[in-house]
Curated annotation (Swiss-Prot):
Alphabetical list of HAMAP family matching this protein: PPAT_bact
Protein name (record): Phosphopantetheine adenylyltransferase
NCBIfam families, sorted: coaD_prev_kdtB, cyt_tran_rel
GN (gene name): coaD
Enzyme Commission numbers on file: 2.7.7.3
Source species taxonomy: Bacteria, Pseudomonadati, Pseudomonadota, Betaproteobacteria, Burkholderiales
SUPFAM superfamilies (UniProt xref): Nucleotidylyl transferase (SSF52374)
Described purpose of this protein according to its UniProt entry: Reversibly transfers an adenylyl group from ATP to 4'-phosphopantetheine, yielding dephospho-CoA (dPCoA) and pyrophosphate.
Localization, UniProt: Cytoplasm
Pfam families: CTP_transf_like (PF01467)
Cofactor(s) this protein cannot do without: Mg(2+)
Keywords: ATP-binding, Coenzyme A biosynthesis, Cytoplasm, Magnesium, Nucleotide-binding, Nucleotidyltransferase, Transferase
Enzyme class: transferase
Amino acid sequence: MVTAIYPGTFDPLTRGHEDLVRRASGLFDKLIVGVADSKNKKPFFSLEERLTISNEVLGHYPNVHVESFSGLLKDFVRRHDARVIVRGLRAVSDFEYEFQMAGMNRYLLPDVETLFLTPSDQYQFISGTIVREIAALGGDVSKFVFPSVDKWLKEKIAAQEQG
């Protein structure tokens, strides 16, 4: 049984993320979506919110499991005896960072491969940062996120504006 890890902050989970999950889940027996507790990035959604959102969107995939992790990715990968780390590459701008991370992961985890997947054409330009910025300015992000995520964004932005 081959287990893969797809790590990220998923702040918020977009249709691009789901596209990668859908495709990667067909390649592996088990895919664990690792929602990073990235305090350094100062996420818009709390870890608990990101876990809930991810489970809402991805819960229908029978071989996909969502859970949080903190600390080094290598420890999370080892804990699950995963053989592959899945990463998405949207553009050339992603490549340098992802290439460096893959090299470091290979050094730390010599028996684990990093698999890069490019998004489907309609999702190549989507990022959580762009989605949050558009939503915060009152723009329509419904083509980039699932309805439940759109609702979460609107509620969180409204609460911040009131608070």
